[in-house]
A protein has these predicted regions:
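A short SAM/SAH-binding and catalytic strip from SAM-dependent methyltransferases
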Residues: 79-90
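Conserved alpha-helix/loop element of class I SAM-dependent methyltransferases that forms part
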Residues: 1-15
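Class I SAM-dependent methyltransferase SAM/SAH-binding core
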Residues: 31-68
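Short conserved loop adjoining the S-adenosyl-L-methionine
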Residues: 68-74
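Glycine-rich SAM-binding Motif I of class I
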Residues: 26-30
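S-adenosyl-L-methionine-dependent methyltransferase catalytic module, highlighting the catalytic core
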Residues: 93-98, 105-200
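Class I SAM-dependent methyltransferase "Motif I" SAM/SAH-binding loop
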Residues: 22-24
Length: 204
């Protein structure tokens, strides 16, 4: 399992109801169901990923995330997860709203465009960066909304959302002290836990 998925695995509580957006081959859901009695669904559009999910016995729905999550009711889940897909959506801000409609908390990971190697690649060489976290050339990339660590935190403030926890790391998805100290510069991958702000007077 990728190191970023291991971190998400640690953040997911026992017996949670989980929705995994862009679930890939279903590795995370499979491990959580087996080890933590987590139930839920994965959404995936890639036929190969869907086939692998089914082979694992993971509940998977073929769905384009750009179409939203209208087929899920408010608070249908405890947690929504999306790894390395936010930057490929037409409206990432609207998807964040949808994720926090379906669940009170979400976990999101994405490549940090302000990572120092990306800055050097663009600033010194004059080309769009290609790296472990951004492996595609500019002309064939699925990424249409590249953002930075600071950009995402600003979006959360605009939406009055609470960042519960965060982790950042290099292309191998390892968290380390230097990237935690200067995440926007040294963190190649951003991992956020975000929740809705509890309304005053609301009960748990």
């Amino acid at each position: 399992m990728r190191t970023d998925l291991k971190l998400i695995y640690d953040w997911v509580p026992e017996k949670a109801r989980l929705l995994d957006l862009g679930c890939g081959d279903g590795e995370l859901l499979d491990a959580l169901a087996r080890d933590k009695n987590v139930t839920g669904y994965g959404l995936e559009i890639d036929p190969e990923g869907i086939t692998r999910c089914l082979a694992r016995g993971v509940n998977v729905i073929e769905q384009n995330l750009d179409e939203g999550l209208a087929n899920f009711e408010d608070d249908a889940c405890d947690l929504v997860v999306m790894t390395q897909a936010l930057q490929a959506l037409r409206r990432p801000d609207r998807m964040l709203d949808e994720m926090l409609r379906v669940a009170e908390e979400c976990i999101i990971t994405f490549p940090n465009f302000a990572y120092w190697r990306h800055r050097v690649h663009l600033g010194m060489r004059g080309y769009m960066p290609v790296s472990k976290s951004l492996p595609h050339a500019w002309y064939d990339t699925p990424n249409i909304h590249l953002s930075t660590f600071n950009d995402f935190e600003h979006l959360c403030r605009q939406k009055d959302l609470v960042i519960v926890d965060r982790a950042v790391g290099a292309g191998d998805y390892r968290d380390h002290w230097a990237s935690r100290l200067w995440p926007n510069l040294l963190g190649e991958i951003a991992i956020f836990r975000v929740t809705r702000r509890r309304r005053q007077g609301a009960t748990a």
